[in-house]
Amino acid sequence: MDLCRNRFPYQFHTVDRENPVAEAVAVRDGKFLEVGTVAEVMQHHCEGTKVVDLKGHTAIPGLNDSHLHLIRGGLNYNLELRWEGVPSLADALRMLKEQALRTPSPQWVRVVGGWTEFQFAERRMPTLDEINDAAPDTPVFILHLYDRALLNRAALKVVGYTKDTPNPPGGEIQRDANGNPTGMLIARPNAMILYATLAKGPKLPLEQQVNSTRQFMRELNRLGLTSAIDAGGGFQNYPEDYEVIAELHEKKQ
């Protein structure tokens, strides 16, 4: 059994209208045994009980995300380079170059959203030339919101987009004056071209998919999420892409 208490009163928010805040909680086998004052909770103290002092931090009930691409995000989490919070485009391009150097073939470098040009000091997106200079040989896929993606020359080669490739029904391949793909994919009229292109990248072996999904879930836990509804989509397949969840559940991870 675990007992959690706080040196300051009323730091547990319960979302219970009749008992909205509490000083301490007792948990046994993953379920709340008591929610109330320190005195009430400490009545459950016995040999082997783990006591956790939150030291003034606030605890809230776990959050549920009703629309999350848990499977897709988990399968690719360890493959992604994340630009959220990066202060400058120069820093982002440096990170891209470093990631490309340590990415083994045939894997790609993937920046799957989570950033905007307005976070950068330069207040602009990277150019295709800058991306090609940072990663001349390793395929790179950079998703910008849901409106476009940037691919370097190496990525265009492995996905097979050429002058003769027609635009798919769900998107547009931007081309230069000679009709050759530039590396920009435009989500017009929808984002299908972005999903379809990202799905062409190589997958991790099952063991590494399990590790990647576990890491993704721990990150969600860090942000306060304890449950989610998987929204599917994005070219993941049932049941094979859901094997990781079954394995993590079996291992209680």
Describe each PLM feature range:
Residues 2-8, 13, 17-62, 66-253:
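Divalent metal-binding segments
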